[in-house]
Amino acid sequence: MKMCNSDACRPLQGETLDTVFQGRLKIIQPEKGYRFSIDAVLLVGLTRIRQRDRVVDLGTGCGIIPLLLAYQHAIEHITGVEIQESLVSIARRNVLIN
């Protein structure tokens, strides 16, 4: 896991820092509105992805699905696409802390 001491790696007001896999994966997400839950973890558990596959997550939100996929599979390239600027910022920060 990456260690990030930058302010960009800390949740801002209105955000929370949550963990998955016994703290091995850290996720910043909005305190209100859409928040990931067990459905993202279950979805990733059902995927059959090979190492050289290219993956795109449309509407990635905080980036939970690409982060889970990267954690569970040795994937060379994952792209998360999001149009909400606030969520893009969170997703980028989540990549930094993981």
Describe these PLM feature segments.
Residues 45-98:
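Conserved SAM/SAH cofactor-binding pocket of Class I
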Residues 7-51:
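Class I SAM-dependent transferase core
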Residues 1-6:
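Short, basic/low-complexity N-terminal boundary segments at the transition from targeting/disordered tails
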